[in-house]
């Protein structure tokens, strides 16, 4: 049985350690991308043409360049051009924050601009300052509207963390490949069982995010 492969040696421990690396990359990236993305989204609503052009260039750059290319560029480019030597995990976190901030910022921008103008005008008529209007009216509604898309982005970041293996990070899929390669000749169904377990591990991480998103939507609607 291929299931026995999981209990040979320290295979389960290795997979769990790989999952921890995956979770570390994903959740640290999500945390900072969320904070910076909200700030970036607010900046994107600025009417200054220069600021808008810079923000648009950053967003389009992130969307046009494949994430894998950004990983390679950061991992090898920083060392060669700037003599900055970072480990693979740090590079992944920085690149994912760079990517996630742009995507989250665009979501926040869209949510902010979707607020009806009459609400803002009414707030001004009642004597609220622009800052008070933003904090008490625009921001709370925007965060509610952006939550489903933001959770979807966070789930994508978790799944995309598997690209880390391509720059030498021993995350859960890399560990799975190592186990499969070591056992392929002795166990023909090794890949099926190992990747099945990895699927389950990703599900354990991603499904609670989906449930949390539904919970927030239900609570805010009520």
Region roles according to the model:
Residues 1-222:
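Transmembrane alpha-helices and adjacent helix-loop boundaries
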């Amino acid at each position: 049985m291929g299931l026995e492969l999981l209990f040979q040696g320290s295979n389960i421990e290795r997979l769990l350690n790989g999952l921890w690396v995956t979770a570390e990359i994903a959740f640290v990236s999500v945390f900072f991308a969320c904070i910076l993305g909200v700030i970036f989204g607010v900046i994107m609503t600025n009417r200054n043409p220069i600021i808008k052009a810079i923000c648009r260039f950053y967003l389009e750059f992130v969307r046009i360049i494949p994430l894998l290319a950004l990983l390679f560029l950061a991992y090898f480019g920083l060392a060669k051009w700037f003599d900055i030597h970072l480990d693979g995990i740090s590079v992944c976190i920085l690149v994912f924050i760079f990517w996630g901030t742009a995507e989250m910022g665009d979501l926040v921008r869209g949510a902010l601009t979707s607020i009806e103008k009459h609400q803002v005008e009414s707030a001004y008529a009642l004597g609220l300052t622009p800052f008070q209007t933003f904090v008490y009216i625009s921001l709370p509604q925007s965060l509610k509207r952006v939550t489903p898309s933001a959770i979807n982005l966070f789930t994508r970041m978790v799944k995309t963390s598997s690209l880390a293996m391509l720059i030498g990070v021993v995350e859960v899929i890399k560990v799975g490949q190592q186990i499969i390669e070591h056992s392929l000749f002795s166990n023909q169904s090794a890949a099926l069982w190992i990747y099945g377990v990895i699927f389950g591990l990703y599900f354990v991480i991603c499904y609670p995010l989906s449930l949390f998103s539904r919970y927030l939507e239900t609570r805010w609607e009520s």
